[in-house]
Design a protein with these regions (language model features):
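Class I S-adenosyl-L-methionine-dependent methyltransferase catalytic core
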Residues: 1-184
């Protein structure tokens, strides 16, 4: 697994041993970032269930302003990958339960232009992930939440003010894009 383009192009990322982490495939990541286009530039990024950090580090490599990477178990790998890409200065790594850290970020008044959520497939609680982001008002105005889930998992059409805007399937993965519903 590697960073596809940008300032850290070609940098190989370390993955944890075993099969507890399922990083987003390079091909899927490439398609995702092609769809996101220029919205990544200068974005404040939140990566929930960050694993290897591939999504946030790819965003930083492509010009995102900053990223918060959250995972319960891969803190050391996130730090190593941020250092490998020379993007550690823009990457804030938080170790802990994703829902608890999301609540902390909300209490701090933090908002993000782009939120990646990549929980384990068959985690069965994608609605909870979306509700945590919506309840904490973590998504900035005009922001986008990108949820990766298993292709066979049920799609959540809405959670709080977040509404499904579009979805795409890539092999065993489905990428769902959510934005805040327009008011008025």
């Amino acid at each position: 697994m590697r960073i596809i383009t940008g300032s850290a192009r070609g940098t190989r990322l370390k993955s944890p041993a075993g099969d507890g982490t399922r990083p987003t495939a390079d091909r899927t990541r490439e398609a995702l970032f092609s769809m996101l286009g220029s919205r990544v530039v200068d974005a404040r990024v939140l990566d929930l269930f960050a694993g290897t950090g591939a999504l946030a580090l790819e965003a930083l490599s492509r010009g995102a302003a900053s990223a918060v990477l959250v995972d319960r178990t891969t803190h050391a790998i996130l730090a190593e990958n941020a250092a490998r890409t020379k993007l550690a200065g823009c990457a804030e790594i938080r170790r802990g339960d994703v829902y608890a850290v999301a609540a902390e970020l909300a209490r701090e008044g933090r908002t993000f232009d782009l939120i990646f959520a990549d929980p384990p497939y068959a985690h069965g609680d994608n609605a909870r992930v979306l509700e945590a982001a919506a309840r904490g008002a973590l998504l900035a105005a005009g922001g986008l939440l990108v949820l990766e889930q298993g292709a066979g998992e049920e799609i959540v059409p809405q959670a709080g003010a977040l509404r499904l805007m579009r979805e795409r399937r890539y092999g065993a993965a489905r990428i769902c894009f959510y934005a805040e519903e327009e008011q008025g």
